[in-house]
Swiss-Prot record:
Any single Gene Ontology cellular-component annotation: plasma membrane-derived thylakoid membrane
Species classification: Bacteria, Bacillati, Cyanobacteriota, Cyanophyceae, Synechococcales
KW Nucleus (keyword) present: no
Family, per entry: Belongs to the ATPase B chain family.
Keywords noted in UniProt: ATP synthesis, CF(0), Hydrogen ion transport, Ion transport, Membrane, Thylakoid, Transmembrane, Transmembrane helix, Transport
GO function terms (MF aspect): proton-transporting ATP synthase activity, rotational mechanism
Protein name: ATP synthase subunit b
Length: 179
């Protein structure tokens, strides 16, 4: 680059300019400046652009590789989760089936227990009925006995006068004393 600058400066000097000065022709000065800029760009641009593009290419390659790695991990995790989901569904189906079986067993046990309870209640009712009948019969016997005693007492009062009662008492005392 410096070589190019020296060459351009030498050519300007040989052209009679006598050195570096102010060139009032802006078009010519701009072309000269543009030529210098293009020279610098052509000399340094391939290295700098190559490095920038290489860095950019590497970043893109790294990003692609990272994305592919994440995609593989995601696919692996998805497969594992789908497997877990299938296992969970199978477990849920098994639990539902067991619950159905348990419900059926419980239903049968409840039906059996209900039948046994019903039989016990019927037997208890029959026993209660028998006990009630016995109680009623005993009550009737007691009432009949009371009525019979009352009737006998009434008959004795009517038949026994005071003399007869005295004789009966004396005879009873004599029987007790004569023993």
């Amino acid at each position: 680059m410096l070589n190019t600058l020296f060459i351009l400066a030498a050519e300007a000097h040989e052209a009679g300019e006598g050195g570096f000065g102010i060139n009032l022709d802006f078009l010519e000065a701009n072309l000269f400046n543009l030529a210098i800029l293009l020279g610098i760009i052509i000399y340094y641009a391939p290295k700098t652009l190559g490095k920038i593009l290489g860095d950019r290419r590497q970043k893109i390659a790294d990003a692609i590789e990272e994305a592919e790695t994440r995609q593989r991990k995601s696919a692996q995790i998805l497969a594992e989760e789908e497997k877990k989901l299938a296992q969970a569904k199978a477990e849920a189906a098994r639990i539902v089936q067991e619950a159905g079986q348990r419900a059926e067993v419980a239903k049968q046990e409840i039906a059996t227990q209900t039948e046994a309870d019903l039989r016990r209640m019927q037997e208890a009712a029959a026993q209660d009925l028998g006990a009630e009948q016995e109680r009623v019969i005993a009550e009737l016997k007691r009432r009949i006995a009371e009525q019979a005693v009352a009737k006998a007492e009434a008959d004795l009062r009517d038949r026994l006068n005071e003399d007869t009662q005295d004789r009966l008492i004396e005879r009873s005392i004599a029987q007790l004393g004569g023993r």
